[in-house]
Amino acid sequence: MENPLEHLHNETHQAWEANAEVWDKRMGDEGNDFFNLLCWPALASFLPSKSDAHILDIACGNGLTTRRLAEMGYQVTAFDFSANLIEYAKQRLDKYGSKTSLHVIDATNEAQLLFLGKNKFDCALSNMALFDMANIEPLFQTLPQLLKPGGTFIFSITHPCFNNASSMHVVEEMDDGEIKTIYAIKTSRYMTPYSMRGLALRNQPKPQVYFERPLQYYLNLGFKNGFVLDGFEERAFPPETPQTTPLGWGGKFSEIPAALVIRMRLNS
């Protein structure tokens, strides 16, 4: 019998297999505003300085970050647990064949991760994926074996404080001698990890499961497995960013970070 975590993991896997086509069409080769305005600038700034570094792209989806990395000259090994997403990635990355290697691997499975090879990678990267994983402990435990001494793990996540599944976007009027419109975030859950179903794209066939964890969970898990924190950037949309919906993420929330990008380094 499946335990609750295994059940949620299997549900997540089924959701991403079902949603792969819709996700690939939406993200394409260029991604969305979350990727281009929030995540990628910080991720890119944290990458290794040597252009021939070997990077592990964790939960690569349709190959969005893989392509960017290959274009920068890096050697990239990428994987995802969705076979459907890997097929889309192969199609989009065909011309980068000499620079990229794609695999169907489950990031929650230590044995599958070790298949990639020990002391092989200068850097591991995960863009907006850790909160889609039912259990991230096997990944953090295995990365020190996959990375070279002093290697780095760079990851972006939705900001645990302000952009979690319990967050509500609020607009209010305030009068302090003049009428001001205030855009704010109201959140009711943070400290205790929990899971909740949601839609990343409104037309996706199957809801996915979000696994919400406080910031201390991610950092302490890294510290426990030999990493130190050496890069930290909270990312908010610029004020001029258009709103896709009246209360969606955009320039109206320019004082509230929607994403967080972290670099951790093995303490060699």
Name what the model sees in each region.
Residues 1-24:
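N-terminal, positively charged/glycine-rich alpha-helical extensions of SAM-dependent methyltransferases
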Residues 33-52:
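Conserved alpha-helix/loop element of class I SAM-dependent methyltransferases that forms part
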Residues 54-58, 62-112:
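Class I SAM-dependent methyltransferase SAM/SAH-binding core
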Residues 113-123:
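A short acidic, Gly/Pro-enriched loop at the edge of an enzyme's catalytic core
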Residues 123-136:
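A short SAM/SAH-binding and catalytic strip from SAM-dependent methyltransferases
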Residues 137-152:
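A short glycine-rich, Lys/Arg-flanked "PGG" loop and its adjoining helix->strand segment in the class I
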Residues 155-220:
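SAM-dependent methyltransferase
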Residues 217-268:
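C-terminal lobe and adjacent flexible extensions of AdoMet/dcAdoMet transferase-like proteins
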